[in-house]
Amino acid sequence: MPKSERKILLDFEKPLAELENRINQIRELAKDCSSVDVSEQIYQLEAKATQLRQEIFSSLSPVQKLQLARHPRRPTSLDYIQAISDEWIELHGDRGGSDDPAIVGGLARVNGRPVVIIGHQKGRDTKDNVARNFGMASAGGYRKSIRFMEHGNRFGMPILTFIDTPGAWPGIEAERLGQGEAIAYNLREMFHLDVPIICTVIGEGGSGGALGVGVGDRLLMLEHSIYTVASPEACAAILWKDASKASQAAEALKITSWDLKKIGIIDDVVPEPSGGAHANPLQAAENLKTAIVKSLDDLNHLSSPQRRKKRYQKFRSMGVFLET
């Protein structure tokens, strides 16, 4: 989990931060003047802070959820892997000369059960983000991920994927190396794997970059994550030639977990701690682990042919339209 670092505040969090700072100041003053009892005042302010936190995080707009999904302190794939795994061995390379750092994966045990885990990996700071390409995988990253999936399928190990990317890397080099083909190959192969596949959006789920590791029997989303065909900024720039209309685009795109659950795109929403996953990473990881274990237990009751059939039907039912 992330170490304690300088707190980064989003605009809608500032009133809460001011109240928490006031509580801390009163506590410090009480230490210097032990004869004054401020316990009742602190109790009232803490109750007010709890209520304010609940009000803020229960009524977030889509664009505010987007800000949370992109929060620099939000737990990454490696944070969750290390928190939910009994054991973890990272694997490397696509066996074609590439080892894309934007994709991590390997073998793990979750509640004693051997699994393969794959995820997009963002950086923790600017230097790390540059090294990880901000979680935007290239063709080699998707070939690396399908290699790990095929390994899991060969040995009967369920596959867990963590999605957290603005999208696949759009660079010329990525296109030259077959970015589109690599993602398309993954989509086709994931439909045919025999083992259970559980995909979880832990932050940003952007376009084909998310889909490249996003075909599964269960699609989960953390409460304040987002899943979209295009970023709200890109959508606004395309439709209205004005990226400043991102808030309007975010509303129209239905990018939030509860919107997507309502229209049947995802299967379940994993609750986050009050204040978001970055406010209590360990609790967020525990919630995620509980949801994954439950999904694995449910999927184990199905045969491989049943899982493959339901997986295919699940994705075929998305985006159905009628011609008139």
Curated annotation (Swiss-Prot):
TM region positions: none
Q: Which GO terms describe its cellular component?
A: acetyl-CoA carboxylase complex
GO BP: any one term = malonyl-CoA biosynthetic process
Cellular location of this protein? Cytoplasm
Its keywords, alphabetically, are: ATP-binding, Cytoplasm, Fatty acid biosynthesis, Fatty acid metabolism, Lipid biosynthesis, Lipid metabolism, Nucleotide-binding, Transferase
Q: Which InterPro entries match?
A: Acetyl_CoA_COase_a_su, ClpP/crotonase-like_dom_sf, COA_CT_C
**Catalyses which reaction(s):** N(6)-carboxybiotinyl-L-lysyl-[protein] + acetyl-CoA = N(6)-biotinyl-L-lysyl-[protein] + malonyl-CoA
* Pathway(s) of this molecule: Lipid metabolism; malonyl-CoA biosynthesis; malonyl-CoA from acetyl-CoA: step 1/1
Q: Name one GO molecular function term.
A: acetyl-CoA carboxylase activity
Limits of the CoA carboxyltransferase C-terminal domain: 44-298
EC number annotated for this UniProt entry: 2.1.3.15
What protein family is recorded? Belongs to the AccA family.
Report the protein's function.
Component of the acetyl coenzyme A carboxylase (ACC) complex. First, biotin carboxylase catalyzes the carboxylation of biotin on its carrier protein (BCCP) and then the CO(2) group is transferred by the carboxyltransferase to acetyl-CoA to form malonyl-CoA.
Q: How does it assemble?
A: Acetyl-CoA carboxylase is a heterohexamer composed of biotin carboxyl carrier protein (AccB), biotin carboxylase (AccC) and two subunits each of ACCase subunit alpha (AccA) and ACCase subunit beta (AccD).
Q: Spell out the protein name for this chain.
A: Acetyl-coenzyme A carboxylase carboxyl transferase subunit alpha
State the organism named in the record. Answer: Trichodesmium erythraeum (strain IMS101)
Gene this protein is translated from: accA
